[in-house]
């Protein structure tokens, strides 16, 4: 049996940058074991499989696999899969914005697809309501796992905290780009720290950026998911936005910002984040988006 697939680069406007994603637009009765085997063979941070939805609101149901396991939600798979399905004509497009609903493991979430001249552009997803874990008090285990002196973490003057808008990630602030470049993660040790916190990934960021229009520079490590480093992580961009809002880093009058990621991997990415807040300034709605570029189309023999 041969299964069609498409590979796209997400959170970029040019090929061979951003975060690559394999999309199987028709899962054709594959078993869970076959889906996992295909994801392992593709060896990308995620591979998605599109099925008929069980929720009548949804345009489709998407299952997401890393090389190691199935996960209930992820950012760049949501954006990239919606783009592929829009280009394939799987639902009607209306200018300037087409809203669809995408069924994933955490529920059915809305996505807005920007459309110009009948062509899909940026895809923006609405993530779940943010939730916040306890602040990490002992800096030594995470510092050792990242190959840093604990004093470097202390210089950031911001807390290390697990945050979720669908998937929980440990948000780790650094003071500057120099310390970001000095990261030498011990993935086994980092996996232990993340498991102890119930987090999927470690999203390390600094407010010092390379691009003048970016607000934060980030790197992502998810060893438990089989992803040593990820070039663009939408599921962590939302939690970072909520974190920056709660800790007073993002000005109240600022509603959106850009995260640059993947630069150290040679796959520069740009993730757009929008924050809506209540009267007290607490984040209520998180939207994350970006553009997608098609790269490869082919078949997988199963």
Regions found by a protein language model. Give the residues of each.
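Active-site proximal loop and beta-alpha junction motif in alpha/beta enzyme cores
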Residues: 1-74, 79-302
């Amino acid at each position: 049996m041969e299964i069609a697939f498409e590979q796209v680069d997400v959170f970029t406007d040019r090929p061979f940058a951003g975060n690559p994603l394999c999309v199987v637009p028709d899962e054709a009765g594959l078993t869970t074991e076959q889906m996992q085997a295909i994801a392992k063979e593709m060896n990308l941070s995620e591979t998605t499989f599109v099925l008929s939805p069980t929720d009548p609101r949804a345009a489709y149901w998407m299952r997401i696999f890393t090389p190691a396991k199935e996960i209930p939600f992820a950012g760049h798979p949501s954006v990239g899969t919606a783009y592929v399905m829009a280009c394939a004509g799987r639902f009607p497009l209306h200018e300037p914005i087409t809203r669809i609903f995408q069924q994933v493991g955490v529920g059915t979430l809305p996505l807005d697809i920007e459309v110009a001249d009948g062509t899909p552009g940026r895809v923006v997803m609405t993530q779940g309501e943010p939730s916040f874990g306890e602040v990490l008090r002992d800096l030594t285990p995470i510092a050792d796992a990242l190959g840093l002196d604990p004093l470097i973490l202390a210089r950031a003057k911001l807390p290390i905290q697990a945050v979720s808008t669908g998937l929980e990630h440990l948000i780790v602030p650094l003071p500057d780009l120099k310390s970001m470049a000095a990261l030498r993660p011990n993935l086994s040790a980092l996996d232990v720290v993340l498991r102890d916190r119930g987090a999927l990934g470690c999203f390390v960021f600094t407010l010092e950026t390379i691009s003048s229009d970016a607000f934060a520079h980030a790197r992502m490590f998810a060893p438990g998911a089989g992803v040593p480093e990820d070039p663009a992580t939408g599921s962590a961009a939302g939690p970072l936005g909520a974190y920056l809002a709660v800790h007073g880093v993002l000005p109240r009058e600022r509603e959106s910002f850009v995260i640059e990621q993947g630069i150290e991997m040679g796959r520069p990415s740009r993730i757009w984040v929008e924050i809506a807040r209540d009267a007290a300034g607490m984040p209520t709605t998180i939207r994350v988006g970006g553009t997608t570029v098609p790269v490869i189309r082919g078949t997988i023999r199963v």
